């Protein structure tokens, strides 16, 4: 009996990941656990938001859309859409202390939004770890005196290969001389010229097939690196946020050390200033183009990780009164500042490369895998001690990818554990994590085949594109207009001690949904069939891409119909009201925080536990404070 009455039961210790010597009294929620401290949450969220796209997509978008002029619409979209949506998702998860499924006790009919988030996180988690595994492969390949993509004398090279370092008198540790005019002219005019880095990527690493349907063989080196990547992710999450919260002290901060080292090295190179000017020189006429604003809005939306479910999940492990408003501003600004900073790192090196080749910067600028695994590695071969710079660059990519991957996996695991919710699965959370990791590894195997890059880009372009916009829009509408904006504002005031600022109230109700709708319309208008270099995807593969996108969105109406059919009511309208109003257990997870309108009307029994208590037994009545200070109840959310 004494053990049962102690402050912490053994099952709680095992579930929340605390080691025996770690004082769990710091955790408010003994059932789920909390972050060790607030720095862990901030670093984890920074690692989640700051990913590969900050390095390989934003600098190219900025250069293509007017240079420094692109910063204006970019930061406008950050202020009016990015930060408000970030704050909404953090406050949503923190208030309920639930993952992306459990939070929809707020309006059970919209629980399909949570399932849609899970589907999106599954897709992203599968292909994102394949990108990390390729970075691992390049990292291991850089542990040589001479980078394997430096010269054209390898078995996989073709007669079209041309390298500025093919001269045998040039060693890897010497400063490359200026290019002769005839070589520069040849590089400009020879259409067949391929670089050693491009052939290494296409003919050796990928052994790229000629069609998306021709899978060929599984590339065993990539498969091994994929296994390494998933093992690392699993080990870092073996105790949930208790273990990942310690890892992020390194994974979320060291990339900035590497960026700074690469920046200092880059700006000291000849031609770096030219590259930076290409990146920053404003073309103010571009601001009048709708495409620039659309790209800015899309980049803000996708780079912050909105509607993936990760923000809700990470915030659910916060203590109830944590200032998530402050955190959302800090993390969002850090994410965008990192994107701008990475642009200096990328374009300083590309400017140096363009200067060496005697070509325009636009000829070497690229984005996506082409930048990370072809253009930038080729530029690194021009530097003295190039393997060192290559090791640093790919180690940075690995850490950036892992920071996002941690949250993607934890999103799925938390959703499963919260949904099942019994004591057995709480004690076996580590096995759930292992099961999800193994499933992710198996599903990623086709992406390591010779046609894998085609499928990876297909998933990247469709699985997490306009579906995220739809999910985010429905989330905004359901919280602000179905649950009720006044209800939600009062929830935040109860949690933080102050209501959301007026600016955020306006953004949540009007501005942000309008911007999200604009992004959706822009995505439809600007849609172009996916291509990879000169390869045109067959129409049937594009249809598969659309099916992947719809698979997450379709969860919303299907679950709404399911919930509507299983809800009691005398009339259709009555059933609709019952299906959309909050569940009885909606609200703060801990009894000590269920005050005022969330206070239980009956004394909870020991079997019910102390974490989650029911609301009023008849209906989830939420009192609203009128203008005269009196209290009134709002039953309907419609």
Swiss-Prot record:
Phosphoserine found at: 605, 630
Ranges where the record places region Disordered: 1-29, 597-638
Domain of life of the source: Eukaryota
Presence of keyword Ion transport: no
Chain intervals for the UniProt region annotation (Essential for interaction with EXOC1): 627-638
Entry-linked InterPro entries: Na/ntran_symport (IPR000175), Na/ntran_symport_glycine_GLY1 (IPR003028), SNS_sf (IPR037272)
Alphabetical GO biological process terms: glycine import across plasma membrane; neurotransmitter transport; regulation of synaptic transmission, glycinergic; sodium ion transmembrane transport
Catalytic activity: glycine(out) + chloride(out) + 2 Na(+)(out) = glycine(in) + chloride(in) + 2 Na(+)(in)
GO cellular component: plasma membrane
Keywords: Amino-acid transport, Cell membrane, Glycoprotein, Membrane, Neurotransmitter transport, Phosphoprotein, Symport, Transmembrane, Transmembrane helix, Transport
Subcellular location(s) of the protein: Cell membrane
TM region(s), chain numbering: 41-61, 69-88, 112-132, 220-238, 247-264, 300-317, 329-350, 383-402, 431-449, 465-485, 506-525, 544-562
Signal sequence, start to end: none
Membrane topology according to the record: Multi-pass membrane protein
UniProt GO MF annotations: amino acid:sodium symporter activity; glycine:sodium symporter activity
Residues modified to Phosphothreonine: 603
Record topological domains on the Cytoplasmic side: 1-40, 563-638
Extracellular side, ranges: 133-219
Glycosylation sites: 169, 172, 182, 188
Function: Sodium- and chloride-dependent glycine transporter which is essential for regulating glycine concentrations at inhibitory glycinergic synapses.
The family this protein is said to belong to: Belongs to the sodium:neurotransmitter symporter (SNF) (TC 2.A.22) family. SLC6A9 subfamily.
Quaternary structure, from the entry: Interacts with EXOC1; interaction increases the transporter capacity of SLC6A9 probably by promoting its insertion into the cell membrane. Interacts with EXOC3 and EXOC4.
Protein name: Sodium- and chloride-dependent glycine transporter 1
Organism this protein belongs to: Bos taurus
Gene assigned in the entry: SLC6A9
């Amino acid at each position: 009996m004494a053990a049962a009455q102690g402050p912490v039961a053994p099952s709680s210790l095992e579930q929340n990941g605390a080691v025996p010597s770690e004082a769990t009294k710091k955790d408010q929620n003994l059932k789920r656990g909390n972050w060790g401290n607030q720095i862990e949450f901030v670093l984890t969220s920074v690692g989640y938001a700051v990913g590969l796209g900050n390095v390989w997509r934003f600098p190219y978008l900025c250069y293509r859309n007017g240079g420094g002029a692109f910063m204006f619409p970019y930061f406008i979209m950050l202020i009016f859409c990015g930060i408000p949506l970030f704050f909404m998702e953090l406050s949503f998860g923190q208030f309920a202390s639930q993952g992306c499924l459990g939070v929809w006790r707020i309006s059970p009919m919209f629980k399909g939004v949570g399932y849609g988030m899970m589907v999106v996180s599954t897709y992203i988690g599968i292909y994102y770890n394949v990108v990390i595994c390729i970075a691992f492969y390049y990292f291991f390949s850089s542990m040589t005196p001479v980078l394997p993509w430096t010269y054209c004398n390898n078995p996989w090279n073709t007669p079209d290969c041309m390298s500025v370092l093919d001269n045998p008198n040039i060693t890897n540790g010497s400063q490359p001389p200026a290019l002769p005019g005839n070589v520069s002219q040849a590089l400009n005019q020879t259409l067949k010229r391929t670089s050693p880095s491009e052939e290494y990527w296409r003919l050796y690493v990928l052994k790229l097939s000629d069609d998306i349907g021709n899978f060929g063989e599984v590339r065993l080196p990539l498969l091994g690196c994929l296994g390494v990547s998933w093992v690392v992710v699993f080990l870092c999450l073996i105790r949930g946020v208790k273990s990942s919260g310690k890892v992020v002290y390194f994974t979320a901060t060291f990339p900035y050390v590497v960026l700074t080292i690469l920046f200092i090295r880059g700006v000291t190179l000849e031609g770096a200033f030219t590259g930076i000017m290409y990146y920053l020189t404003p073309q103010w006429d571009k601001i009048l183009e709708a495409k620039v604003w659309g790209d800015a809005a899309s980049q803000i939306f996708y780079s912050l990780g909105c509607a993936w479910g990760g923000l809700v999940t990470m915030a659910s492990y916060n203590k109830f009164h944590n200032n998530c408003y402050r955190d959302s501003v800090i993390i969002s600004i850090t994410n965008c500042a990192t994107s701008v900073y990475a642009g200096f790192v990328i374009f300083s090196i590309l400017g140096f490369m363009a200067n060496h080749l005697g070509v325009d910067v636009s000829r070497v600028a690229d984005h996506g895998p082409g930048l990370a695994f072809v253009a930038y590695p080729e530029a690194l071969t021009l530097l003295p001690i190039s393997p060192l710079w290559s090791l640093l660059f790919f180690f940075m990519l690995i850490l950036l990818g892992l920071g996002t991957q941690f949250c993607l996996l934890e999103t799925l695991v938390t959703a499963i554990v919260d949904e099942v919710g019994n004591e057995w699965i709480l004690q076996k959370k580590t096995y759930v994590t292992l099961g999800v990791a193994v499933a992710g590894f198996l599903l990623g195997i086709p992406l390591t085949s010779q046609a894998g890059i085609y499928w990876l880009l297909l998933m990247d372009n469709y699985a997490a594109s306009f579906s995220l916009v739809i999910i985010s829009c429905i989330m905004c509408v359901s919280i602000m207009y179905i649950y009720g904006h006044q209800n939600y504002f009062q929830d935040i005031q109860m949690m933080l001690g102050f209501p959301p600022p007026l600016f955020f109230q306006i953004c949540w109700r009007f501005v942000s949904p309008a911007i999200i709708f604009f992004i959706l319309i822009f995505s439809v208008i600007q849609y172009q069939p996916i291509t990879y270099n000169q390869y045109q995807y067959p129409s049937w593969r594009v249809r598969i891409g659309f099916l992947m996108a719809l698979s997450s969105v379709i969860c919303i109406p299907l679950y709404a119909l399911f919930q509507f059919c299983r809800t009691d009511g005398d009339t259709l309208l009555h059933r609709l009201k019952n299906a959309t109003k909050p569940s009885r257990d909606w609200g703060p997870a801990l009894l000590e925080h269920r005050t005022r309108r969330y206070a239980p009307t009956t004394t909870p029994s020991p079997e019910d536990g102390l974490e989650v208590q029911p609301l009023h037994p008849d209906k989830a009545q939420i009192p609203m404070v009128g203008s005269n200070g009196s209290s009134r109840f709002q039953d309907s959310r419609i």
